[in-house]
Swiss-Prot record:
Gene Ontology cellular-component terms listed: cytoplasm; cytosol; endoplasmic reticulum membrane; Golgi apparatus; nucleus
Record organism: Pongo abelii
Matching SUPFAM superfamilies: Activating enzymes of the ubiquitin-like proteins
Protein name: Ubiquitin-like modifier-activating enzyme 5
UniProt-annotated location(s): Cytoplasm; Nucleus; Endoplasmic reticulum membrane; Golgi apparatus
Assembly information from the UniProt record: Homodimer; homodimerization is required for UFM1 activation. Interacts (via UIS motif) with UFM1; binds UFM1 via a trans-binding mechanism in which UFM1 interacts with distinct sites in both subunits of the UBA5 homodimer. Interacts (via C-terminus) with UFC1. Interacts (via UIS motif) with GABARAPL2 and, with lower affinity, with GABARAP and GABARAPL1.
Motif UFM1-interacting sequence (UIS), residue range(s) on this chain: 334-346
Amino acid sequence: MAESVERLQQRVQELERELAQERSLQVPRSGDGGGGRVRIEKMSSEVVDSNPYSRLMALKRMGIVSDYEKIRTFAVAIVGVGGVGSVTAEMLTRCGIGKLLLFDYDKVELANMNRLFFQPHQAGLSKVQAAEHTLRNINPDVLFEVHNYNITTVENFQHFMDRISNGGLEEGKPVDLVLSCVDNFEARMTINTACNELGQTWMESGVSENAVSGHIQLIIPGESACFACAPPLVVAANIDEKSLKREGVCAASLPTTMGVVAGILVQNVLKFLLNFGTVSFYLGYNAMQDFFPTMSMKPNPQCDDRNCRKQQEEYKKKVAALPKQEVIQEKEEIIHEDNEWGIELVSEVSEEELKNSSGPVPDLPEGITVAYTIPKKQEDSVTEVTVEDSGESLEDLMAKMKNM
């Protein structure tokens, strides 16, 4: 009896996986993006419950982004749809990116459930198929292209190069950005090689093996250091990942750290594509101290990658060809130069009085101040009246009061 129940449970799980796989392979009907609504041709800022873009379009109204609708014209390739890559893909999908190209050779496992995005019923499906099915339901306006293979093999590398150079929103045009969300050195170097050869801008990301730190890095071939110039991560040497899995050893992973890294990666992507804020060339994250170091790295003139050295030479020529801009220092205009009467504006309260009336202000880093200070509690001043003892009794005092 117990064996038959176990067999039936296994059969149910197999059928659920097959059903999920069939659903992910279904071709959307005309006018239907595969989700629960029809495709929206134009983004709108109208504030109604049925508009999924109203909160995003508010960025334009508030002056953060000048043209948010432009996000639908971009195509982004994500290599690695794991703990960081899947969340990155979800965020970009919710933001309304034009097209996503997903690359991963792995399958969804129950061991992935400690991370974000994937669900237990998707176990056994390829990560790219499971991701496409979920993402299409979230936002049917986004175009998806998925590739279930390992980009590091010789036969797949050329196809990978072709898709990032011709798989843009308009076929034959390159993608606008490549995002590396892989977890091994070989795949990072493969992406680095392809992007250096094509002159393709990309962003690299990673989480440490102890799961409490991570980083993102913007790499513009020729302008900034490539992954071969200065690898930002120390990867364990002479370790075969497959043998580690066989021996029951694996790296730690926290959904919190991966979510933070995916968040700062997508934030950097949006700033880069939509041209707002400051784009970070390198941003680290240390969860133990809540520390976010930033820096930028110049390319190495002796880089081992010849295409990197070639891109550096082309970038130098490009900079040299730019017209030199003369910096004209404007003279500050003096307002009310004549002050015949020597009038000065003086505060009614001195700095010392203001300091004494305010509470203690903590030592804060540069650029941070308190919103307000709590005034010190003023002790009520009570005037003490001293009465001398006359030595008279209460009856004598009462008699004096009656005679008054």
